[in-house]
From Swiss-Prot:
Known partners and oligomeric status: Part of the ribosomal stalk of the 50S ribosomal subunit. The N-terminus interacts with L11 and the large rRNA to form the base of the stalk. The C-terminus forms an elongated spine to which L12 dimers bind in a sequential fashion forming a multimeric L10(L12)X complex.
HAMAP family: Ribosomal_uL10
GO CC annotation: large ribosomal subunit
Entry's family note: Belongs to the universal ribosomal protein uL10 family.
SUPFAM superfamilies recorded: Ribosomal protein L10-like
Protein name stated in the entry: Large ribosomal subunit protein uL10
Name of encoding gene: rplJ
Source species of the chain: Variovorax paradoxus (strain S110)
């Protein structure tokens, strides 16, 4: 199906706005993937905040021109699906995880932070934990010294007082009587 000029401009405009918001672009060849598998990939991507698009490569090149993803314009050949995500690792994770279970989806490359990524770069990006997991790990690291100190103080109080109530409680009871 051929697009007329106004439809092409609309596609370019949509993809340009996607590229402006996105941190990551992942490209994968989808030759031979069934419609059911593609639907499953798209629904998984949608749930993770990733936008997948099958575009004509010339339209994709024009859409990313002037953006951080322009550096991968020369890699835009063949039947590709483009994954854009605002989360730095989401697009790479979705595509790499799907490629593990479906050998017909072949990662071709991508871009992140103004740098082109090869296949290994996309896979390394996919192995980075998500933002939520990283924040949870950071919080755990920050809480660890505090909880250790609390355990040491509790053990010290147990050792000194033999498990009795703190001495501050006794004067409060005497004043109430």
């Amino acid at each position: 199906m051929s697009l007329n000029r106004s439809e092409k401009e609309a596609v370019i405009s949509d993809v340009t706005s996607l590229a402006a918001k996105a941190q990551t672009l992942v490209m994968a060849e989808y030759r031979g993937i069934t419609v059911a598998d593609m639907t499953k990939l798209r629904s998984e991507a949608r749930s993770k905040g990733v936008t997948l698009s099958v575009l004509k490569n010339t339209l994709a090149r024009r859409a990313v021109a002037g953006s951080a993803f322009e550096i991968v314009g020369d890699q835009m050949t063949g039947p590709l699906i483009y994954g854009f995500s605002e989360d730095a690792v989401a697009a790479a994770k979705v595509v790499a995880d799907f490629a593990k279970t479906n050998d017909k989806l072949v990662i071709r490359g991508g871009a992140f932070g103004g740098k082109a990524l090869d296949v290994n770069g996309v896979k390394q990006l996919a192995n980075i934990p998500s933002k939520e997991v990283l924040l949870a790990q950071l919080l755990g690291l920050m809480q660890s010294p505090i909880s250790r100190t609390a355990r040491v103080l509790a053990a010290l109080a147990e050792k000194r007082g033999g498990g009795e109530a703190a001495p501050a409680d006794a004067p409060a009871e005497a004043q109430a009587a």
